[in-house]
Amino acid sequence: SDYIDSSWSKPKVVNLGWKDERLNMGTINFSTDGRTMFFTGCYWPGSQGGCDLYFSKSAGSIWLEPTNIGNSINTSTWESQPIISSDSKKLFFASKRAGGKGGSDIWMSIKLKDNTWSPPVNLGDSINTSKDEMAPFLHADGNTLFFASKGHPGLGGYDLFVSRADALGRWSLAKNIGYPTNSLGNEINIFSSIDGKRSWISSDRAGGNGNYDIYEFDNYNEIM
């Protein structure tokens, strides 16, 4: 969907360029130049098992056959919701892999010189809890991380939180971004504009059209 004259156009199906008979794919994220697409594919042939992370390169108006991102990141459990940093050097994602704090955690991997990915690092106790953390979104500034959590104190269900990295890459204690962005329902997924002025979330709060809807709002101090 394109934003034209202060409104969104009717959604169009992405031209993937490959025959899509696979069971499930989603949580798409693009590199800054728009030429690499990262996404989740579940129970695909040749996968590590469960849901894995994949990437695809653009070729004009279509997308080339996807590539599994590899077993340095993917496991036999569940990896999902990739987000690439604006410089394409860091990949954040959610995973239920061994070695976490419990439930699904948020992890980070660094792109190496040979274009492979380093073994991922758990983002630690300031972000991950014994319950579920998921849906990471790294702002274009490279230091502001948003995510959904059931483990940190919240208003109900999943809430959205923000953490910021210092000069040494240490993440601050997660902060609930508050009402009215969070509600008594579930808020999962947030995207903020490059200029930091607007954000979009998905929520199943009361008053929507059913299940999860997308909401748009102007940012406030707790956001940026």
Regions found by a protein language model. Give the residues of each.
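Short, conserved micro-motifs composed of acidic
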Residues: 1-224
